[in-house]
UniProtKB/Swiss-Prot annotation:
PANTHER family cross-referenced by the UniProt entry: KALLIKREIN-1, KALLIKREIN-RELATED
Record-listed E.C. numbers: 3.4.21.-
A GO molecular function held by the record: toxin activity
Compartments (UniProt record): Secreted
Family membership noted in the UniProt record: Belongs to the peptidase S1 family. Snake venom subfamily.
Record's protein name: Chymotrypsin-like protease VLCTLP
Post-translational modification summary for this protein: Partial deglycosylation has not effect on enzyme activity.
Length: 257
């Protein structure tokens, strides 16, 4: 299951916000209002995804979150209450590993978005650093978003929820999901006993370890947070050179094989 959701409701409020948003965490608690300054919401009135601000003009998300006419919301907390620090941008240009936007569940599910204008940092908006090294197995990392907090009967909050999960050995994911290759440019992460995990609509959001974005929510089981059913996250460290090359202006840079 790719962790994306068709939103049933159009955005409400003055500039229209969704009553049911598209990024969340089963088993988490409401995030501190200053904890998710890099978290962004991608929305086009039908679909929603998460993303991560990595500098004033660039957002990182998942390739399967690509959508037309997307608006990018920064500085959000409660989707039904406006705050003065919010900013909205659109995508000026999108970059993918392959020109045909091809990706698999274990490779190249990554999208880099150049915003139409630079973001102004403030109390509720700040970038997240790219990884300096990959996370170790056993590392405790943070997930966050506004999506489903129960599964399979989905309920959605108005505020983002956060939770801690662990980096697991890739062999755990291979045992949980048949057909995976021997190696992958993904991270396997979750709680083995279940009860906590990324869920429907969390796609594109961050996996944060030691203050760095180490993963991008990619896919998991149809029923979220089940025992021995962790989630796959695109391994950002493997794409760091590609990301930095694109940002530096080398728009023909290629992803790792």
């Amino acid at each position: 299951m790719v962790l994306i959701r068709v939103l049933a409701n159009l955005l409400l409020l003055q500039l229209s916000y969704a009553q049911k948003s598209s990024e969340l965490v089963v088993g988490g608690d409401e995030c501190n209002i200053n904890e998710h300054r890099s978290l962004v919401f991608l929305y086009n009135s039908s679909f929603g995804c998460g993303g991560t601000l990595i500098n004033q003009q660039w957002v990182l998300s998942a390739a399967h979150c690509d959508m037309e006419n997307v608006q990018i919301y920064l500085g959000l907390h409660n989707l039904r209450l406006r705050n003065q620090d919010e900013q909205i941008r659109v995508a000026e240009e999108k970059f993918f590993c392959l020109s045909n936007k091809s990706y698999t569940k274990w490779d190249k599910d990554i999208m880099l978005i150049r915003l139409n204008s630079s973001v102004t940092y403030n109390t509720h908006i700040a970038p997240l650093s790219l990884p300096s090294s990959p996370p170790r197995v056993g590392s405790v990392c943070r997930i966050m978003g506004w999506g489903a907090i129960t599964s399979p009967n989905e309920t959605f909050p108005n505020v983002p929820h956060c939770a801690n999960i662990n980096i697991l050995r890739y062999s755990v994911c291979r045992a949980a999901y048949r057909g995976l290759p021997a190696q992958s440019r993904t991270l396997c992460a979750g709680i083995l006993q279940g009860g906590i995990g990324s869920c429907m609509g969390d796609s594109g959001g961050p996996l944060i370890c030691n203050g760095e974005i180490q993963g991008i929510v990619s896919w998991g089981d149809d029923i979220c947070a089940q025992p021995h059913k962790p989630v796959h996250y695109t391994k950002v460290f493997d794409y760091s050179d590609w990301i930095q090359s694109i940002i530096a202006g080398n728009t023909t840079a290629t992803c790792p094989l």
